[in-house]
Amino acid sequence: MREILKNVRRLVVKIGSSSLTHPETGKINLAAMERFVRECADLKNAGFEVIIVSSGAIAAGMGRLALPEKPKNLPEKQACAAVGQGVLMHLYEKFFSEYQVIAAQVLLTGEDLAVRKRFLNAKHTFSALLNYGVVPVVNENDTVAVEEIRFGDNDTLSARVAVLVEADLLVLLSDIDGLYTADPRKNSNARFLPEVLEINEEIEQLAGGSGTAVGTGGMETKIEAAKIAVNAGIPMVIARADYGNLRRILRGEEVGTFFYPKKKKQWKKQWLLSGARVQGSIIVDLGAEEALCSGGKSLLPSGVLGVEGEFPTGAIVAVKNLKGRVIAKGLTNYAAQDILKIKGLHSWEIADVLGHKDYDEIIHRDNLVLVD
């Protein structure tokens, strides 16, 4: 199955803080960073399109500010990120320039990928950068993006970027070889998993909190990234950030843990799964669940039991079954308050209740994507 990696031309590579810093001091490891840039530059010069999602801004800020340990409160973390992002980007520009490659800084927040208009604008910007032959270096805008600092969002950010740029592959480089049955640093009996066919409950349970002193993410966020990528039809590999591993992965060698992709979805449905901000939920009955999941139908008011939250027309909503499990996401044709009035009714009754009928469906099937 790894044979598909030989056809990759556009890849997103996320490198973690632990792979760019000295473990003793938390400061930037210049030799490690130079080796990483050299391999990416070599891939670029060989005809690959490379997008980097780089952690390390907070760690770089710690070094510049001479802090002995990672700050614990949010304002100090954001201050470190503000100082460190400039340091980090200066180093990327310096190292890439040695190989005649231009690097560009791209700072994103969750909002940039959650709002469709901003998502499209970011998509066009990346397209222009790649057409210019530039290597985009992406980071969460740590200074303002509270969620990233709290939850280690660069793993899932990289998956969202992979969806955004329609990448052929996502690679997460870390200080660990891939996914194990237990943390190999704590359990000598841990067994390495070279491939994951499906991200089921068992796989999710294997992901423990293994963040490092300078990083914010662990295996749990990497599994979340894998869900986003494979559901969008993008294969993903978790591997150790050793020099040469990217080349080996692209040759189809068994490096790291390979996550098998699912069938590629239309870009709108990829956005709904990966970046769109959910504003509320619609609860459906068994008949509607079957119609959506097995019949590929639109969601009609007759199958709706209720709503959660308040949301306007055109909002992104989750569709939940009777057990509370999210089975789909979609763009709603009606606001929450109107859905409450027409739930359980036939489509021809909508106008009688609301005084107008803009659509027969609550969510049209073209604007709905199933959550696997």
Swiss-Prot record:
Q: Which GO terms describe its cellular component?
A: cytosol
What sections of the sequence does the record tag as coiled-coil? none
Task: Please list the reactions this protein catalyses.
Answer: L-glutamate + ATP = L-glutamyl 5-phosphate + ADP
Pathway(s) the chain acts in: Amino-acid biosynthesis; L-proline biosynthesis; L-glutamate 5-semialdehyde from L-glutamate: step 1/2
Q: What class of enzyme is it?
A: transferase
- Report the subcellular localization: Cytoplasm
- Disulphide connectivity of cysteines: none
**Keywords on record:** Amino-acid biosynthesis, ATP-binding, Cytoplasm, Kinase, Nucleotide-binding, Proline biosynthesis, Transferase
The cross-references to Gene3D superfamilies, in alphabetical order and at most eight, read: Acetylglutamate kinase-like, PUA domain
Which one GO biological process term can you cite for this protein?
A: L-proline biosynthetic process
Q: Give one GO molecular function term.
A: RNA binding
Query: Where, by residue number, does ATP bind?
Result: K14, S174, D175, T216, G217, G218, M219, E220, T221, K222
Task: Give me the residues that bind substrate, please.
Answer: S55, D142, N154
Q: Which domain of life is it from?
A: Bacteria
* Record EC number: 2.7.2.11
Q: Where is the PUA domain?
A: 279-357
Q: What is its main location?
A: cytoplasm
- UniProt record similarity statement: Belongs to the glutamate 5-kinase family.
Q: What PANTHER family does the record point to?
A: GLUTAMATE 5-KINASE, ISOPENTENYL PHOSPHATE KINASE
Q: What does this protein do?
A: Catalyzes the transfer of a phosphate group to glutamate to form L-glutamate 5-phosphate.
Q: What is this protein called?
A: Glutamate 5-kinase
- Native source species: Carboxydothermus hydrogenoformans (strain ATCC BAA-161 / DSM 6008 / Z-2901)
The lineage is:
Bacteria, Bacillati, Bacillota, Clostridia, Thermoanaerobacterales
